[in-house]
Amino acid sequence: MPLAAALLLMLSAVAASPAVAAEEALTAAHALLSAWHEDPARIDQARAQLEAAVTTDPTPETLTELSRVWFLTGDFRARTEAERVTAYERGMETGRRAVALAPRNDRAHLWLAINTGRTAEIRGVMRALALVSTIREESDTVLKLNPSNVEGLVLAGSLAADLPAMMGGDKAKAEGFFKRALEIDPRLTGGRMELARLYISAKRWPDAQRELQSIVDETAATDLPRWTVRDRPRARAMLTELRDRGRIPAAPAPAPGPSPSP
């Protein structure tokens, strides 16, 4: 949807009934977020619209989307660690509200878990043991409700990859979760990045190279904004670092052009 149309929906939602306004706010937010890489301020616009909607009609769908937008705010709009923590904590709070209204909504549990995970990352795992327990519970709930939730599979894989063994970490299980996610959605570059990170930690250099190159070469990423802003630049940088350290072969030199005519 063009940005102008999304803005019209935002304006019309102001005068609509609460239920209609919530639906229109959700539609407008989706339109804004589909191409936020073109203007990251669209994240802020979507958040403002959803905040207004949940004030009058806090539906599970709008609360869940707002929880996701708070995550995007923390990852891509916050300028300081304090702002990041605030964003993720707001995402947690909103996620809890969504779960309370719709306990069987797997996406509500997902974004509660993801925002909680980001908060734990900032605090440090050993200082956030209670949060880790919440993340694991919510992650398990996501997959119980929907075993094919792709982002839920990536989340489960990330937990298995990053937690120490004494807290449930398991590299083999992590690989299985990531591969299952990519079987369902091969163009989910965030999941492929997590798999590449796992391979690097295991010193499986050719496997890591394959996944990173696949990210760079992607032509139809599921999450285009994330691929544009984070995954592709990061994959390129990681490939360069692996080559510089001699972990993978140097990139082939470009083929010479045609000889000039005499």
What residue ranges belong to the model's regions?
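TPR alpha-solenoid repeat register
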Residues: 62-63, 108, 152, 191, ...
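Residue-level recognition of tetratricopeptide repeat
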Residues: 59-60, 105, 149, 188, ...
